[in-house]
A protein has these predicted regions:
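Thiol-based oxidoreductase modules, predominantly thioredoxin-like and allied folds used
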Residues: 72, 91, 96-109
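Conserved small/polar residues in nucleotide/adenosyl-binding loops
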Residues: 77, 142-146
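A short, hydrophobic beta-strand/beta-hairpin element that forms part of a small beta-sheet core
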Residues: 121-134
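A short beta-strand-turn-helix
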Residues: 42-66
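N-terminal targeting signals for export/organelle localization
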Residues: 2-47
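Typically the conserved alpha-helix immediately C-terminal to a functionally engaged Cys/Sec
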Residues: 81-93
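Structural micro-motif
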Residues: 109, 115-124
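Short pre-active-site segment immediately N-terminal to redox-active cysteine/selenocysteine motifs
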Residues: 65-66, 72-76, 119
Length: 146
């Protein structure tokens, strides 16, 4: 009887671990397989791909070749977590047309400070030419598309 109970428990545990690991793997494949362009940036990458504020502190000069959205977020932030799937949908819809970048404010404190990020999520909307605009708080897919 103990052997049967132990076997059932072991199989249940194995099934649970396998199911959880399988979900994580398919999520990563989904992000790569659908050409989603959500890129997590460090300060060095931001300076190269978006705006080198150290070299040009007074003049905005976008370094990219197409418009971009920069999401300043934190992993513990509820509204940031709610915004993540919305940005993934935008990345699918506008793949190849818009860069979508994410910056973890806890890992990149200096970068967040340089932009005066006080509330998260904060979205920095960067047009191909002209000055960027800012949106704060979680917003819906419909609002982001407008």
């Amino acid at each position: 009887m103990k052997l049967i109970k132990s076997t059932i428990t072991a199989l249940g545990l194995l099934f649970t671990v396998t199911a959880c690991a399988g979900n994580k793997e398919s999520k990563n494949q989904n992000m790569k397989g659908e050409n989603m362009e959500i890129v997590h940036l460090t300060k060095a990458e931001f300076l190269k791909k978006v705006y080198n504020y150290e070299a040009n502190p007074n003049d905005w000069k976008y370094e990219g070749d197409k418009p971009a959205i920069v999401d300043f977020y934190a992993t513990w932030c509820g509204p940031c977590k709610a915004l993540a799937p919305v940005l993934e949908e935008l990345a699918k819809e506008y793949a190849g047309k818009v860069y979508i970048y994410k910056i973890d404010v806890d890992k990149e404190e200096e970068l967040a400070g340089a932009f005066g990020i006080r509330s998260i999520p904060t979205l920095l909307w960067i047009p191909q030419s002209g000055k960027p605009t800012v949106t704060q708080g979680a917003v819906s897919y419909t609002h982001l598309r407008a």
